[in-house]
């Protein structure tokens, strides 16, 4: 039987531009009813989001999930902190990484897997301005080689 591909909802393209992604990790998200309905409608923005470890729990901060239009008075706060569902050893490892200088834990993608919302979080090290220029230069060189030789 053919496996159904994960249903990609949102992607943080700015993360690959601003960070060197060292490793990735999949986590579940604790959501309310109107939040999951808004996510299914693809009304989520990951651009300024980050993960913070507080008292042994991981939280997704500053991720904007728009209010559900039929949610009336039961709607959620668009920028509230959302708990990530991870094992204790994963949270402990992320807490150690978060304590290091220059390391950030950021959301890369949000997708639906078997009906549940999942977030792919990445451990990244911030790029300097010259690193960004080198990345652009390398991309242009690769594009030129591909255009010239058809590799």
Curated annotation (Swiss-Prot):
Its main location: cytoplasm. It is found in: Cytoplasm. Gene3D superfamilies: 2.40.280.10. Keywords: Cytoplasm, RNA-binding. The keyword Ribosomal protein does not apply. InterPro entries: SmpB, SsrA-bd_prot, SsrA-bd_prot_CS. One of its GO terms (cellular component) is cytosol. It comes from the Bacteria. Pfam families: SmpB. One of its GO terms (molecular function) is RNA binding. Residues 132-151 are annotated as: Disordered. GO terms for biological process: trans-translation. Belongs to the SmpB family. Required for rescue of stalled ribosomes mediated by trans-translation. Binds to transfer-messenger RNA (tmRNA), required for stable association of tmRNA with ribosomes. tmRNA and SmpB together mimic tRNA shape, replacing the anticodon stem-loop with SmpB. tmRNA is encoded by the ssrA gene; the 2 termini fold to resemble tRNA(Ala) and it encodes a 'tag peptide', a short internal open reading frame. During trans-translation Ala-aminoacylated tmRNA acts like a tRNA, entering the A-site of stalled ribosomes, displacing the stalled mRNA. This is SsrA-binding protein.
């Amino acid at each position: 039987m053919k496996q159904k591909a994960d249903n990609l909802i949102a992607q943080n393209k700015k993360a690959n531009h601003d960070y060197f992604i060292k490793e990735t990790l999949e986590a579940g998200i604790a959501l309310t009813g109107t939040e999951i309905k808004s996510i299914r409608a693809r009304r989520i923005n990951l651009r300024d989001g980050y993960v913070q470890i507080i008292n042994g729990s991981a939280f997704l901060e500053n991720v904007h999930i728009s209010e559900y239009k039929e949610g009336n008075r039961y709607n959620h706060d668009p920028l509230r902190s959302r708990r990530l569902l991870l094992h204790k050893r994963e949270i402990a490892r992320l807490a150690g990484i978060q304590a290091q200088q220059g390391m950030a834990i950021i959301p890369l993608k949000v997708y639906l897997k078997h009906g549940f919302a999942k977030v792919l979080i990445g451990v990244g090290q911030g790029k300097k301005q010259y690193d960004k220029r080198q990345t652009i230069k390398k991309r242009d060189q690769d594009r030129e080689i591909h255009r010239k030789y058809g590799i």
